Amino acid sequence: IAFLAGDAAPRHFENPRQVPAFEYPADYGPRPPSFSRATLVESAERRQLFVSGTAAIRGHATIAVGDLPGQLACTRENLHIIAATAGAGADFGAADDWQRTLKVYIRHARDLAAVSRDLDDHLLRPGDIVTYLHADLCRSDLQVEIEAVLTKDV
């Protein structure tokens, strides 16, 4: 999203198992990034939860370096945690009729089938809209990153 405007102030959320990005140590660059893990926008018609790029990070460290299944498991867990923290449920909005749109960024094109199969088995449900993108990620030791928009009519 390049720009989002509305009448209500958005609410920002962090993952309690991750250091907020703006508190990252200098190991990751001269200035820490400035984003929240998720932002909830509510109106009279709908609730939208914008989940920032989520990957296999605990604290500020990359988890399961070189282990794609391990990174996928940690990434899925982080998605569940941030959704629960923001009020969309510990199941990443699955049980509460949230429409889910995901972008899945994959470092190595050869991993597409494995990533797709893992998400089909452990995260996705019928009706989810998913786009897989071959892309460079923010850290060289990350193999997959997922961002999402969860929308629920009220």
PLM region descriptions:
Residues I1-V154:
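N-terminal presequence-like segments and the immediate start of the first folded domain
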